[in-house]
Design a protein with these regions (language model features):
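Bacterial N-terminal signal peptides that target proteins for export
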Residues: 2-13
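N-terminal signal peptide c-region/cleavage motif recognized by signal peptidases
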Residues: 19-21
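Active-site histidine-anchored catalytic micro-motif
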Residues: 27-28, 40, 52-58, 68-75, ...
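N-terminal signal-anchor module of multipass membrane proteins
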Residues: 30-37, 42-43
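A residue-level signal for conserved active-site and pocket-lining positions in enzyme catalytic cores
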Residues: 34, 163, 279
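Alpha-helical scaffold segments in soluble metabolic enzymes
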Residues: 44, 48, 76-79, 125, ...
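Anionic-ligand-binding alpha/beta catalytic cores of soluble enzymes and soluble regulatory domains
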Residues: 148-230
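A conserved acidic, glycine/proline-rich C-terminal tail/linker
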Residues: 214-289
């Protein structure tokens, strides 16, 4: 009996150890960067990923993030993340601090997605929207492309793409990425959507690059709480670094076809967030507006 008990305890301990080890093994890597397509950078990263496991699926989120624009990288991850299956591995390379002491991390969200990225603010909107369960520091002694130790300017290929591939292929567990972070992630401050003094306030988080519509972070629930109605008219003001750049009265509509060509309208975009457009025009270009954490918007009932 004592021998049987010891074997049981040993097996039970191994079971607990194995069951607490989290493997992604989704076989999916979603890749975004500010590299563009004019050189071989994107192809190099993909080559590294396929070299780890040829069966991996690589999806390009975008490689047209404006150079060094960490905020837009954060937004595009937030935009795409909810449509991917659990355990998918995102790798984001917008890394103006490459080769410095900024941290290289893998974050696991509460909804079971993995994000491989420099800890430079890229995780801001992922954390706010989905919550980050754990962050691990990438152990570069173990998870770095062979022969790249003297390369200091392409962590996207040598560390991030390589680590993402190993995680997605199930070659390493999340715990094997490296030690748990003992510091909070770097976050970019911005105006959260609120109703304050009977005014709806938020941030212009992104532009629709094709059509020039401006998208805010003001969601459908807050719009309903404020009492916005179809065909209602509202005073809209836009500020950049606290300087007013736009002011006009705009009507709220369900879709573009509810207005005449050239008319401005407030509407709910595909993410059910408040947006502004010019019907068959480019609102942002027309009014010289942009997006980011320093672009604020207010909506007020007439």
């Amino acid at each position: 009996m004592p021998g049987l008990t010891q074997r049981f305890l040993k097996n039970f301990t191994l079971f607990l150890l194995f069951s607490s080890t989290v493997f992604a093994k989704s076989g999916i890597v979603i890749f975004q960067s500010d590299f563009g397509y004019k050189d071989a950078a994107v192809s190099e990263v993909k080559g590294v990923i396929y070299s780890v496991d040829k069966s991996l699926i690589i999806s390009d989120l975008t490689h047209d993030i404006p150079a060094y624009n960490i905020w837009e990288a954060s937004y595009r991850l937030y935009q795409a993340a909810p449509y991917w299956p659990k355990a998918s591995v995102f790798v984001s390379v917008v890394d103006p601090g490459v080769g410095t002491q900024r941290r290289s991390v893998v974050a696991l969200t509460n909804n079971g997605l993995y994000f491989v990225t420099p800890d430079n603010g890229t995780l801001t909107l992922i954390d706010d929207a989905y919550g980050i369960k754990e962050v691990r520091l990438i152990d570069e002694r173990k998870h770095r492309l062979k022969g790249s130790n003297n390369s200091y300017t392409f962590f996207g290929r040598d560390v991030y793409g390589y680590t993402a591939a190993k995680l997605a292929a199930g070659e390493i567990s999340f715990a094997e990425v490296g030690p748990l972070s003992d510091k909070p992630i770097v976050k970019i401050p911005y105006q959260k959507p609120v109703i304050e003094n009977n005014i709806l306030r938020g941030t212009i988080v992104i532009l629709d690059p094709k059509y020039g519509n401006i998208w805010t972070n003001i969601d459908e629930n807050l719009i309903n709480a404020y009492g916005m109605k179809a065909k209602g008219r509202y005073q809209v003001k836009i500020y950049h670094n606290q300087v007013q750049k736009y002011s006009d009265i705009i009507s709220f509509h369900n879709t573009f076809g509810d207005t005449e060509k050239g008319a401005n309208l407030l509407y709910l975009n595909s993410l059910l967030k408040l947006a502004i457009a010019t019907n068959q025009g480019n609102f942002a270009k027309l009014h010289q507006l942009n997006a980011g954490p320093d672009w604020l918007i207010t909506i007020e009932k007439l």
